From Swiss-Prot:
<dbReference type="Pfam" id="PF13603">
    <property type="entry name" value="tRNA-synt_1_2"/>
</dbReference>
<dbReference type="InterPro" id="IPR009080">
    <property type="entry name" value="tRNAsynth_Ia_anticodon-bd"/>
</dbReference>
<feature type="region of interest" description="Disordered">
    <location>
        <begin position="624"/>
        <end position="643"/>
    </location>
</feature>
<keyword id="KW-0547">Nucleotide-binding</keyword>
<dbReference type="GO" id="GO:0005829">
    <property type="term" value="C:cytosol"/>
</dbReference>
<dbReference type="InterPro" id="IPR015413">
    <property type="entry name" value="Methionyl/Leucyl_tRNA_Synth"/>
</dbReference>
<dbReference type="GO" id="GO:0004823">
    <property type="term" value="F:leucine-tRNA ligase activity"/>
</dbReference>
<keyword id="KW-0648">Protein biosynthesis</keyword>
<dbReference type="GO" id="GO:0006429">
    <property type="term" value="P:leucyl-tRNA aminoacylation"/>
</dbReference>
<dbReference type="InterPro" id="IPR025709">
    <property type="entry name" value="Leu_tRNA-synth_edit"/>
</dbReference>
<dbReference type="InterPro" id="IPR013155">
    <property type="entry name" value="M/V/L/I-tRNA-synth_anticd-bd"/>
</dbReference>
<dbReference type="InterPro" id="IPR014729">
    <property type="entry name" value="Rossmann-like_a/b/a_fold"/>
</dbReference>
<dbReference type="GO" id="GO:0005524">
    <property type="term" value="F:ATP binding"/>
</dbReference>
<keyword id="KW-0030">Aminoacyl-tRNA synthetase</keyword>
<dbReference type="Pfam" id="PF08264">
    <property type="entry name" value="Anticodon_1"/>
</dbReference>
<feature type="short sequence motif" description="'HIGH' region">
    <location>
        <begin position="42"/>
        <end position="52"/>
    </location>
</feature>
<dbReference type="InterPro" id="IPR002300">
    <property type="entry name" value="aa-tRNA-synth_Ia"/>
</dbReference>
Amino acid sequence: MHEQYQPLEIETQAQNYWKEHQSFLVRELPDKEKFYCLSMFPYPSGKLHMGHVRNYTIGDVISRYHRMQGRNVLQPMGWDAFGMPAENAAMKNNVAPAAWTYDNIAYMKSQLDSLGLAIDWSREVTTCKPDYYRWEQWLFTRLFEKGVIYRKNGTVNWDPVDQTVLANEQVIDGRGWRSGALIEKREIPMYYFKITAYAEELLESLDNLPGWPEQVKTMQRNWIGKSRGMEIGFPYDQASIGHAGQLKVFTTRPDTLMGATYVAVAAEHPLATQAAQNDPQLQAFIDECKRGGVAEADIATQEKKGMATSLFVEHPLTGDKLPVWVANYVLMNYGEGAVMAVPGHDERDFEFANKYGLPIRQVIAKVEGDNDFESSVWKEWYGAKDESVLTVNSGKYDNLGYQAAFDAIGADLEAKGLGQARTQFRLRDWGISRQRYWGCPIPIIHCEACGDVPVPADQLPVVLPEDVVPDGSGSPLAKMPEFYECNCPKCGQPAKRETDTMDTFVESSWYFARYACPQFEGGMLDRKAADYWLPVDQYIGGIEHAILHLLYARFFHKLMRDEGLVGSDEPFKNLLTQGMVVADTYYRTTANGGKDWFNPADVEVERDAKAKVVGARLKSDGQPVEIGGTEKMSKSKNNGVDPQSMIDQYGADTCRLFMMFASPPDMSLEWSDAGVEGANRFLRRVWRLAHAHVSAGLPGALDVAALSDAQKQVRRAIHLAIRQASQDVGQHHKFNTAIAAVMTLMNVLEKAPNQDAQDRALIQEGLETVVLLLAPITPHICHVLWGQLGHAEAVIDARWPSVDESALVQDTLQLVVQVNGKLRGHIDVAASASREDVEAAARANENVLRFTEGLSIRKVIVVPGKLVNIVAN
């Protein structure tokens, strides 16, 4: 055993052992309890960043801990390999996305191996390979035949120069990110998953996920957005519109209907089109609206704009004429593309009405307190629907609470055939068509005679050609007759293959299930294997995936269940959302007002006498730089730390230990070079103590019955550490406090006497405990030390230590003694001492006598096992 800790040598030795013994290869063992631990798989961008390292280390610690509990543990890994970055890199480097992707996968896989992750690589999936997406296409055809997938026109961002559809994030200030052209909104045929058919179940089954963070469940509930309201028909004013009809709106606030003063429609609404026919200004405004973003988030933040039309509708209860406006905040795909506006009691309508001088009518009043209604200043209570408000200025509906007004107005609308109660969801159907090359081909053939025909199962997969280098102008597949020319599977006539590809969220919506049976060729899933492993017991990933990915994966799991592929209702039993990795930022402002960012490694920090940071200089020129505070590690802020350089310098175990010790997993982790140094120092201490112990020769067995009082205290420290770490790792995932418990134990072991066989046997038990408790966190050093401590089997196959409760029992206790709440001393008493004995010992304490001299003792408070407080005056 080397005297010095040599991480590179140790880590190579451990990793070679795991590889040779296929330590992480698992099979279904029906008689053994399983544990499926999964970290969200990475996009193969080129190299790992610290966020990846944190995510995968957390998963690895949990996996290894459960293996030490005797469970059959699956921890797989794969690659979310389709997507736009590969196309962008391909255009930049003039290389096919496939080649770029596979090169990145090879490099990132070697990085994951260097971290020492307990991954079963025999189950690796790569989503851009036909053996994976073939089954996605198969499910698509099944769902298309059942009507769960359908085709309809959808609004997209169209770049007229590049002749392509852009994602919302590729539209910057209304222009294409590459071409700079003004973006148009276009209607094109797209495929949709009918996720709304599962909205109720997706909402209700959140209640069956106690192992999910409440924050994530709330975000999903809000996204699904179930609301009870009414669909109300506003009859057309035939004089202005020219024919009969109704403008249908959905509202959750029919109680405020008497306050409606106008209606607003989307730019694409038929009434907007009609009104613009003889109004060039309105047409120009509609065109401007169509150039705006199509995402709800864009619409929420953009300036609210509108324009009046010459059209009117009638108020369904009063018959009053209400003007029809076109507004940029109304979505055509929400309800029927129209909203009723009640400016008095909706903040968005209130701002809009004030901007354009539209009437604001109060129909709700606060019962008490500040109940003045001002039409120029919005107050929170205007939008209330609780017991603090009642209806006013509403004729026969006056003095009613929210529910009573809802019911009364609703009943009258239903009687007139102008309204019906409805439950609506904010959730929209999921459009998955992408006019891109690097994605899974949609398995549909368009035939003039037969319509849209799914590709038959025996003709799947529809293989994406991998030798294409996109140039950014339109979809490459649409320019490849060899790809799209085909015959109709139904009638045999010449037909055209669909050239759109699927949203990459589709691949990540079912990968967790394919890990159960990645080589299975008899179907999408092997039901037996899927039912053994699923649901995932612990899923780990960033909070940024709280809505889309996690919602789509839950949806897909239910689709697969209804297809008979899995037996469970939910994919992920427990969810851990890890925090970000943040680091200091430094910059200089450039002449044009921009910022040049400098990596923390290139900056020297200046501190005052109290070690507070007072300035920073660039090492290369010695000149000052601005301190930008701590932010998420990113390329844009140049504050990332390359994991590979850390592993090369300190070893993977140091990286892993720092990551787990610096912060609880669900909180942000602040990168600190000093913290990494500290983690490395601690591992060197463990190695040093073990080396000294092993060099002296391994001791015989410990005789627990013959321990001295001092030795009992050492053994108690060992078992306190086991108890603490078992709770922290196994129950709470508080790895930082588990590590702190091991550090406390190390302090005890380093000071423990080393005189006789009992002392050495006790240090042996202590070191074995340190190694076992650290094994999930720093597996390489523990692999080597376990062997050096005399064990034939590898630590990967060892069991987690159990607490010897008898070791925790104390013959004597040390109690704190206070006088009037202030610490005045300590007393040692027998663990079995009575309250009277404890009080007598406290009163007799030398310090207590000094601080109570001349005072009357009023009472003595004894907290058993902890303290005595003497109250005197």
